[in-house]
């Protein structure tokens, strides 16, 4: 009987894998229309994988990547204590800011500014309180 139970357990269909939750990593602002997103299509973001994207915000362009929430929100403080992780992530952040600056004027953001979603970022930019954080 135990073998039958085991066989049934193994026969269960696998659950579909859900994509990991993402947060917004913010690199900086440019004036609209800003550099073309196409110029950065091969550039990888702070996590080494996510593309760099423009996001329209209050008449400006916010440059962002959608990065894993577990790494850049839930565990950011812990990860920042890991000097290897911190060095790699901050270098990638700076490389993105430098690439944007080569295409035009940019107001860079410091490393570690994350938002839950597009609306959260837009709200902060529109409130102008955000500029105290830069």
Regions found by a protein language model. Name each.
Residues 2-134:
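An interfacial alpha-helical scaffold signature
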